[in-house]
């Protein structure tokens, strides 16, 4: 065994190894290794993969151990005592490990392996389920897993392309380097490498003299792989880590083995990174510009779609033309509810997302030193907000108008039915009355007949007077239907006019007949008092029964328990009068029986009917029985309505209970979010975490709102129009909920933008807190923005010379144009941070991009399309070629392009 302390301690693996792999390199390793944990979850290795890993990992270890004059033969056995493992770690890290124990006992081996594992862990690596005992026992899975962890940490971790993770960075590097080669499509670290072309393409890209790529065939993978492995071993000092047959004969080569092999190519070619770094800078700048253009196009499209939807929806909400029937109005109400439930919520989310996208775009433009984005005319955020306010204004009161119209139509239907009922009863009563009044029977009647006719006429007049109220009610109902704009008012008016004309005619005929009867009354002597008394008492009683039947069959509409209880009380009062009415009925029938008894006892032959009235005892008994039948039916109808109103009251209280809980909860959350956005408790990440917890709690609260919506739906279906148990309406709750969602999303976006600004500009947490404290001090109304005077006072407090003089005003106007490019008159905290960070930190500039292009151009003042296509990805190379102006300098060559004017245009210093 070679003494590993004699190994070359000055060796450092890769450009970022050594001390960088110590404390500094381990800073992000925890996160990185957590990302790699899911690569090592299998309990058992596939035999083919295990074979590939053994060979690859053994070759990789020997490529480093040979620098210390040693090597391993069996990866399971040679690391069991921990000595070569510690030696390997010293070689690849360039650091000295604790002195190993030289004993041969198991405890000495475990201690040595633990020293190696402790050193790996000190680099920020999570060793999941790997223990010293398994390594000492020669556990193949644990040993291979440990070596893979070492390879990840010391050979792959520092590979980063465009801020990607190690694995993604290595894959992106391979994709870029092999992109120009036919039959090569690197998408992974297994089957993409089976045909060997990708290995040959990597070598040819960096050392084209070593490979004749055009002579390689895709259908000969073994030859391709052996060619690449032999060339790499002979000319690039990369040991052969895999057998071509093992790769070809495996359905899916081992990913870890391929990554280990490919990482050796990456480190071998790392010396060619200067041009790639320059290309990366240009790619990054172009990617930012392309992304910003994409975001601008998305904003314009989304804004146009949202404004078009608002334009189409507002006329529909402003259409307040009432319909003629309840069914039509209920359909309009259902359409409106469908709009609130289905159509509007996605648009609320689109509006919120549009504002977030706009703010994020502006932040990215400021951070990348680009001019502020000005949407096309009519598509500003303020235009969208104005359109949305117009939509809300049109929507306001629409549902209330619909419900009022339904109530109006319901009232109209009730009145129309009541009119038809009363009119039918009146028309039935008047049927034949005109013919009766026009009779001239008194001209040939006897004295007794005349007196009977007089009494009969008096009874008729009494009946006529009793019907006067009904006629007035009919006229009043018709008038109310006219005032409420009943759609069938023409037929109602025609029928009412006919009744009134007939009533006037009856009055005239009644008066004429009375005069004729009174003219002959002096010649009449006797009158049957009993019949007369019967008629006088029977007529009012009959009218009372008709009115009672009419009232008992009258429809009723109530909306509260108090109203139905009032009807029940009135009905109970009516029932209490029935005993007196029954006694009156018996008294009337007794009069009739008395007349019959006298006639029979005196042998008087009666005509069979009372000459003074048409109301017979049979009619009285029949109507009385009808009243007796209608009373329990009325009882049942009132009790059903009482049960319905009790159910409605339960719905009111149920809704009120939920609303009185949801409403204050929303208000409390709004206040807490406002407090969090103003206070400076903890880091921005803490604030963001706190806000996202609030957002999750808000989302988790959505079932309570859905429950309230369901209860509100039940209330609407029950046609309940008021609720005295709560001041919260569903409209208030919906608006509050929408405001809460918008506020939390906007607040989270503000904090994320602050983090983005802080990280991009290198602002410390203490600086961020100082900025927030200064901003809050002058934000007196806690509105989240400063007016010009407040902002000026804040600048003065920070030492800026913006006093009220010509020079100070000019400087202040310059600063305002930076922090408020849209001239809104307000400076947000995000704009304040952007300004302060711009004042205290450096940013990328057009000069840096020009310098990068100069590297790609070989220090020339111009660059050619061929150079761009060789160094940049195809899409970004074509982007530059399409936008670069021809170079006009004296040293111009054919096809020369001006990269300087193009670079300044990227930062708004000139036009593309």
From Swiss-Prot:
Metal-binding among keywords: yes
Segments of this protein annotated with the region Mediates interaction with MICALL2: 737-912
The entry's keywords: Acetylation, Actin-binding, Calcium, Cell junction, Cytoplasm, Cytoskeleton, Metal-binding, Nucleus, Phosphoprotein, Protein transport, Repeat, Transport
One Gene Ontology CC term in the entry: Z disc
Gly residues bias: start-end ranges: 16-29
Chain residue ranges for the region called Polyphosphoinositide (PIP2)-binding: 178-193
Calponin-homology (CH) domain segment(s): 51-155, 164-270
Entry-annotated residues carrying Phosphothreonine: 250
Summary of the function given for this chain in its UniProt record: F-actin cross-linking protein which is thought to anchor actin to a variety of intracellular structures. This is a bundling protein. Probably involved in vesicular trafficking via its association with the CART complex. The CART complex is necessary for efficient transferrin receptor recycling but not for EGFR degradation. Involved in tight junction assembly in epithelial cells probably through interaction with MICALL2. Links MICALL2 to the actin cytoskeleton and recruits it to the tight junctions.
Name the UniProt record assigns to this protein: Alpha-actinin-4
Organism expressing this protein natively: Mus musculus
Organism lineage: Eukaryota, Metazoa, Chordata, Craniata, Vertebrata
Gene: Actn4
